[in-house]
Amino acid sequence: MTILLTILASLLVFGAVIAVHEFGHFAAAKLSGIQVNEFAIGMGPALWKKIAGGTQYTLRLLPVGGYVAMEGEGSPESNQAERARDGQPEAAAENPIPPDQRTGIPFPEAAIWKRAIVMAAGPLMNFVLGFVVLVLVVATQQEVITSRVIYSIDEGALCGQTGLQAGDEIVAVNGRRCFVTNDILYELARTRDTQADFTVRRDGRLLELPGVRFDTYTGEDGGTRMNIGFTVYALARTPLNVLKESVNSELYYSRIIFTSLIDLLQGRESINNLSGPVGIVSAIGQAASYGLTDVVEMLVLITVNLGVFNLLPIPALDGGRLVFLGVEAVIRRPVSERLQENLTLATFILLFGLMIFATYNDVIRLFTGGL
């Protein structure tokens, strides 16, 4: 039962996140007057297909991928390679739309700003999905909306003895701006010792509180844990507070993804902690065992992760395509297609290698009880 629940939850999460991403590209291309030859959801053999409005809509067997085929996007060889990567049959490389039914212009003939919108629309839709889901969660499932204003400090707590006071509004921790309570907790969790520098608003003035210290306790695993030692005020569940909490929570998710990447590059986090598809599926399965709310929150994390990751300036990603378009706008001619293909292939191989390494980490943790 647990395995079945994990599979169903994973298909739901991955299917929703990828479908929304591809729909963003598709909708932007259509609105920009670009010919979309195929909009496919899923990978593998086609279960259903229909041509309407100059586009073939395809539903494929495995609901864990998607594809938007625009007229003139890349060379025939690169298009065939992309389709192979997305698990689509070689026969699909042929244009399914007869010339007299095509309603748009080829992708390269569209204005640069329109092509940029098409590339950015996929990640943007991931952020939109995350925001909509967060609004629903905050409005209906989240027990309480918390503020950043300290309500009380535990009696004898070190944080109260070293600077914090009831009524303080926490603005930043260790120089990093905090928008929601989770920002505060995240920054404290990243602290290497048991003290942190706070910026608070007290009586209308900003104050710097360096070296605020926290009590510690020993966890069940024998590790040292930080005891926060204070509580914050709750906010009324008004429409405005729900929207603000949803926006700030999405910023929080985006921020921890960026911060995790930076920590990885700076060596603060070991590359051995990198997790791949197996780890993600395992996390979704754990969330499913706790309930629907946890699965939905996992969906938010994954969709925001996909949005942020795809905007990175890496040639194999949407962000890399945006960089190529930016260069084209500056030099007033397209970047060499061969150069684009070579850079895309090189970074795709690198990303694929990282995924294999992360999957290896996941499998090791799975068999050693780390997942």
Sequence positions of predicted segments:
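Small-residue-rich helix-interface/hinge motifs
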Residues: 3-95, 312-331
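PDZ peptide-recognition modules
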Residues: 4, 78-114, 118-121, 125-274, ...
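Alpha-helical transmembrane segments of integral membrane proteins
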Residues: 5-13, 301, 348-354
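Membrane-interacting alpha-helical segments
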Residues: 40, 65, 240-266, 278-281, ...
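Membrane interface segments of multi-pass transport proteins and intramembrane proteases
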Residues: 47-51, 149-153, 326-342, 369
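Transmembrane alpha-helix interface/packing and boundary motifs in multi-pass membrane proteins
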Residues: 263-267, 303-317
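Small-residue-enriched transmembrane helix starts and helix-helix packing motifs
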Residues: 291-308
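Juxtamembrane boundary at the C-terminal end of a transmembrane helix
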Residues: 357-371
